[in-house]
A protein has these predicted regions:
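Short, positively charged
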Residues: 13, 31-32
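Active-site beta-alpha loop architecture of Rossmann-like, nucleotide-cofactor-dependent enzymes
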Residues: 73, 83, 95
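Terminal helix-turn-helix DNA-binding modules in bacterial transcription factors
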Residues: 4, 8-25, 44-80
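…primarily DNA-binding HTH/wHTH and HhH modules…
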Residues: 1-5, 90-97
Length: 97
């Protein structure tokens, strides 16, 4: 399996688990890499840091649900693993601009 396929496999894992706690070590293990090596390769191949990628995907998913469902921000905040709902409205406004 080449590195592209490993990164793809780790991204698939992230997508499946967006609403769960995601361990960065577990993501790296999906690519059969150490965390430090995976961080470097992920950023090089995607142009974004791993944590930022996860944060952005959760934000986009929560924004989509906010617009297309009747779910409340507080429910979405907890669903997408925000510790408190307070930062989500501001982040969503930035995302929707």
């Amino acid at each position: 399996m080449d590195m592209y396929e490993r990164i793809k496999k780790s991204i698939d894992f992230i997508e499946i688990n967006l609403t769960e706690h995601i361990s960065l070590n577990e993501v790296a293990s999906k690519a059969f890499c150490s965390l430090s090596y995976f961080h470097n390769v992920f950023r090089l191949m995607t142009g974004i840091a791993l944590k930022e990628y996860i944060r952005n995907r959760r934000l986009v998913s929560s924004a989509y649900e906010l617009v297309n469902t009747d779910r409340k921000i507080i429910d979405l905040a907890y669903k997408y693993q925000y510790e408190t709902p307070s930062p989500l409205p501001e982040l969503l406004l930035k995302c929707l601009e």
